[in-house]
Swiss-Prot record:
Oligomeric form and interacting partners: Component of the eukaryotic translation initiation factor 3 (eIF-3) complex.
Native organism: Culex quinquefasciatus
UniProt cross-references to PANTHER family, sorted A to Z: EUKARYOTIC TRANSLATION INITIATION FACTOR 3 SUBUNIT I
Family: Belongs to the eIF-3 subunit I family.
GO biological process, one term: formation of cytoplasmic translation initiation complex
Pfam families for the chain: EIF3I
Name of protein: Eukaryotic translation initiation factor 3 subunit I
Reported function: Component of the eukaryotic translation initiation factor 3 (eIF-3) complex, which is involved in protein synthesis of a specialized repertoire of mRNAs and, together with other initiation factors, stimulates binding of mRNA and methionyl-tRNAi to the 40S ribosome. The eIF-3 complex specifically targets and initiates translation of a subset of mRNAs involved in cell proliferation.
GO MF, one example: RNA binding
Keywords: Cytoplasm, Initiation factor, Protein biosynthesis, Repeat, WD repeat
Any one of the GO CC terms: eukaryotic 43S preinitiation complex
Length: 328
């Protein structure tokens, strides 16, 4: 496995996403400039300039025409993917931590941190016709994580048919919200640490969560029933499900502030492949000299990308031996 090294960010990567076809990778980092790359050869196509703080999240719509980012400069921005121009900016009360387009692309959601006297809030906005007036438009729906929840949203997904939103929280809980009634449908507390990341399977029936409690867990995306647990010795920052095999890839490592040795050989910063059903680790891939902050599978399942605290995005393309591998 000879990786592609995508070098362009000056600071730690916060999130990476493939578009639906998998020909583009979008990456955000703590350096104010979300970037877009060709996934085939690692060429950087451009940056999206406009944020004034660390960019925490990114998502691209189904047609790869629009991009949404949320940042520490207390704003969420919508971009034209092709030209890099800002379509609209939404001011927030605190840092925007998560942002996602719905499957239809008609709506988008973003959440803000619990900070400066404001509770963590979740917003649903209409993004069919975005222009500069979106900064003053009221959201379609606003959910406040009030006294009963009192924990900030750290990751978020859209549920089936754009009817629900799934949120992962700082206290390890995962909740499903009905967007019609603005009420909580279900919640589980299987994790004991902050939920760093959640990603859906290709068909949307399952989701994998990555937590600081050193485990990743597989849930039914409708009932939130915990199906499988993948155990490691270190915090898991990101996890993704293969679209073609029954495999899960996990990435993490020590927290950035606890890292003392940054040797790639120490084995602390590998991405780890687990069997989806048997919960057993069967491979590790070295490379980063710092924790892995974000992972994403290519939609064709033949490669995956990792973004690390070292500021690099690495694209790992699987060898022939990966496809011939039989789990015993």
């Amino acid at each position: 496995m000879k990786p592609l090294m995508l070098q362009g960010h000056e600071r730690a990567i916060t999130q990476i996403k493939y578009n639906r076809e998998g020909d583009l990778i979008f990456s955000t980092a703590k350096d104010h400039k979300p970037s877009v790359w060709f996934s085939l050869n690692g060429e950087r196509l451009g940056t999206y300039n406009g944020h004034q703080g660390a960019v925490w999240c990114v998502d691209v719509d189904w047609t790869t025409t629009r991009l949404i980012t949320g940042a520490g400069d207390m704003s969420t921005k919508l971009w034209d993917v092709e030209t890099g121009s800002v379509l609209g900016t939404i001011p927030c009360n605190s840092a925007a931590r998560t942002a996602n387009f719905s499957f239809s692309g008609n709506q988008a959601s973003y959440s803000t941190d619990k900070a400066m006297g404001h509770n963590s809030e979740l917003f649903i906005i209409d993004v069919r016709n975005v222009d500069s007036s979106i900064s003053s438009q009221s959201p379609v729906l606003k959910l406040t994580m009030n006294q009963s929840i009192q924990t900030k949203i750290t990751s978020m997904l859209w549920g089936a048919l754009d009817e629900t939103v799934i949120t992962g929280h700082e206290n390890g809980s995962i909740r499903i919200w009905d967007l019609r009634t603005a009420k909580e449908l279900n919640s589980v507390n299987d994790h004991t640490g902050v939920i760093n990341d959640m990603q859906l399977s290709a068909d949307g029936t399952m989701l994998v969560s990555a937590s600081k409690d050193t485990t990743a867990k597989l849930f039914d995306s409708e009932s939130l029933m915990c199906l499988k647990t993948y155990k490691t010795e270190r915090p898991v920052n990101s996890a993704a499900i293969s679209p073609i095999h029954e495999h899960v890839v996990l990435g993490g490592g020590q927290e950035a502030m606890e890292v003392t040795t940054t040797s790639t050989k120490s084995g602390k910063f590998d991405s780890r492949l687990f069997h989806l059903v048997y919960e057993e680790e069967f491979a590790r891939v070295k490379g980063h000299f710092g924790p892995i902050n974000s992972l994403a599978f290519h939609p064709d399942g033949k490669s995956y990308a990792t973004g690390g605290e070292d500021g690099f995005v690495r694209v790992q393309v699987f060898d022939a031996s990966y496809y011939e591998f039989v789990f015993e």
